[in-house]
């Protein structure tokens, strides 16, 4: 019924271009055999059966009620004088109880009455509650139209304090003072260094994650690099020649473009914390995103420096240009065999979704290693070398490793475990959210699935009863080559809600082409760093009466 309400409201608003509909709308008393006919505007429905007549009456009533409420709100808004509000005042209005306020430019709006009418659903509009609309309109360009602005104008309650529109002065003593501006939809796990993930309902809205809401994993302050003076240093092989490559030099190599999903080793760590405390950021399901990356192949660059695949074990070590106060840079490594394999498609990427890399994601150059944990995709790349052993970086030798549930911080031996490279099969539910109330009748469940090493996801199973019975979800996304399934699959299931059911325990699990399956519970895979968290994902929801 709510969906019909929204549809009628939107069609009337668009048809009238949000101008005042003539107030002479007569409602005739109807018998059971009469049709409901407002004189203006004329609404015509097809079909003569009683069901159609019932929906005709209900749809028109809903539409008429929305129009009258809208007209009343417009009149009240016009009568109010302009008020000045601070950014702090706006940020305190984020719920129906306090009122839901947003800003656009210098204007402040109270959209409390409109939230339930939002075509994208209340949850999308609530992401902007207490803050600016611009970052969200940038994601969804359909909003930037005159009739949408006219609708919003009716909810204006005042102006934003001019002082709140002045950019703050940069404090040069603060190593994080020059960090880039981030999208307000991101759920922040750490401000310094900045680490954040998109909310679930935005994460799977698109197959390709928009740059502003791509999950951000930083270990140190974000460097501000000049593309004109940037140089990538590639140490040459014995008898070869070391390279100092400008951004233009990298562009002169053959350009390759691939779609790759990046996932942090700590994705879904928060679920491990529920079993037993772990050390690390409390990532939920959003430390994963997908982009279209473009750049030069690492194997081509290494070959120009004289490197070739050798029989002995060797590693390609990467160093970033981000560093701590001691000058220590972030570093990581991958096996030389992967780096030199053209089929592995490792990139020195300079573009992300058709644009230069954003600063948070490694501008001007980062490593992209398809099928491998995000920790090896070194950003702000400054140096590449081939070494007989893996990188001695803390993040390679003393982090991002998995251990038995029995290992604690008193007994852990980091040298005893290999560094994480390929990640296990993974899936998660993004809609509905845990604790949400869903409509009876049918529920739509959405999520993502991915597996490391280029292994393709071949199936996602979904249960509404905690795993007692299962249904197979529909997979969406690009078809990928065998052993090169570098990107995730989005999935969806429309399932009937059992009659009389008051709650649902929704569960999902993915299967890859190696028939690897997610474990059913967290406890057996718990580890002190909270990495490799890929148990069945569970969401508990309530069913409306």
From Swiss-Prot:
Residues 165-174 are annotated as: Hinge. The modification Phosphoserine is found at residue 123. It comes from the Eukaryota. It catalyses: sulfite + O2 + H2O = sulfate + H2O2. It is an enzyme of class 1 (oxidoreductase). Pathway: Energy metabolism; sulfur metabolism. Coiled coil: none annotated. Residues 175-401 are annotated as: Moco domain. It is found in: Mitochondrion intermembrane space. Transmembrane segments: none annotated. Its cofactor is heme b; Mo-molybdopterin. Residues 82-161 form the Cytochrome b5 heme-binding domain. It is linked to Sulfite oxidase deficiency, isolated: A life-threatening, autosomal recessive neurometabolic disorder characterized by severe neurological impairment. Classic ISOD manifests in the first few hours to days of life and is characterized by intractable seizures, feeding difficulties, rapidly progressive encephalopathy, microcephaly, and profound intellectual disability. Children usually die during the first few months of life. This is Sulfite oxidase, mitochondrial. It comes from Homo sapiens.
């Amino acid at each position: 019924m709510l969906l019909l309400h929204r549809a009628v409201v939107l069609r009337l608003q668009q048809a009238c271009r949000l101008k005042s509909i003539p107030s002479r709308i007569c409602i005739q008393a109807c018998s059971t055999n009469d049709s409901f006919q407002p004189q203006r505007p004329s609404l015509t429905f097809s079909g003569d059966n009683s069901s159609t007549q019932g929906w005709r009456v209900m749809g028109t009533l809903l539409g008429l009620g929305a129009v009258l409420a809208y007209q009343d709100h417009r009149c009240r808004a016009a009568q109010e004088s302009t008020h000045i509000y601070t950014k702090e005042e706006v940020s305190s209005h984020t719920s129906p109880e306090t009122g839901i306020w947003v800003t656009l430019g210098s204007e402040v709006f109270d959209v409390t009455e409109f939230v339930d009418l939002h075509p994208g659903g209340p949850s999308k509009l609530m992401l902007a509650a207490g803050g600016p609309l611009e970052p969200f309109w940038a994601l969804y360009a359909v909003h930037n139209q005159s009739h949408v602005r006219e609708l919003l104008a009716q909810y204006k309650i005042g102006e934003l304090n001019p002082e709140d529109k002045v950019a703050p002065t940069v404090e040069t003593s603060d190593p994080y003072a020059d960090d880039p501006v981030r999208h307000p939809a991101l759920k922040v796990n750490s401000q310094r260094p900045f680490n954040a993930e998109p909310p679930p309902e935005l994460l799977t809205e698109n197959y390709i994650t928009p740059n502003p809401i791509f999950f951000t994993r930083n270990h140190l302050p974000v460097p501000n690099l000049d593309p004109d003076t940037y140089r990538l240093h590639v140490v040459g092989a014995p008898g070869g020649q070391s390279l100092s490559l400008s951004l233009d030099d990298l562009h002169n190599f053959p350009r390759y473009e691939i779609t790759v999903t990046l996932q942090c080793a700590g994705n879904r760590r928060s679920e491990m914390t529920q079993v037993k405390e772990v050390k690390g950021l409390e990532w939920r399901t959003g430390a994963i995103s997908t982009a279209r990356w473009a750049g030069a192949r690492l194997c081509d660059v290494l070959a120009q420096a004289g490197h070739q695949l050798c029989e002995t074990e060797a590693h390609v070590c990467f160093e970033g240009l981000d560093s701590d106060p001691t000058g220590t840079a972030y570093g990581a490594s991958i096996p030389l065999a992967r780096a030199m394999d053209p089929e592995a498609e490792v990139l020195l990427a300079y573009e992300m979704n058709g644009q230069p890399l954003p600063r948070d994601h490694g501008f001007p150059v980062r490593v992209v290693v398809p099928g491998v944990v995000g920790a090896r995709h070194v950003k702000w790349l400054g140096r590449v070398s081939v070494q007989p052993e893996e990188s001695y970086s803390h993040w390679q030798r003393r982090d991002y490793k998995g251990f038995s549930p029995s290992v604690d911080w008193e007994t852990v031996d980091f040298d005893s475990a290999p560094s994480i490279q390929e990640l296990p099969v993974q899936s998660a539910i993004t809609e509905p959210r845990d604790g949400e109330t869903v409509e009876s009748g049918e529920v739509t469940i959405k999520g993502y699935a991915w597996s490391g090493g280029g292994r393709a996801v071949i199936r996602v199973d979904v249960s509404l009863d905690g795993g007692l019975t299962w249904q197979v979800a529909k997979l969406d996304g690009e078809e990928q080559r065998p052993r090169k399934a570098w990107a995730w699959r989005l999935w969806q299931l429309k399932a009937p809600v059992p009659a009389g059911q008051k709650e649902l325990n929704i569960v999902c699990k993915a299967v890859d082409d190696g028939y690897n399956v997610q474990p059913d519970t967290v406890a057996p895979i718990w580890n002190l760093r909270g990495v490799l968290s890929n148990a069945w994902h569970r969401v508990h929801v309530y069913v409306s009466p």
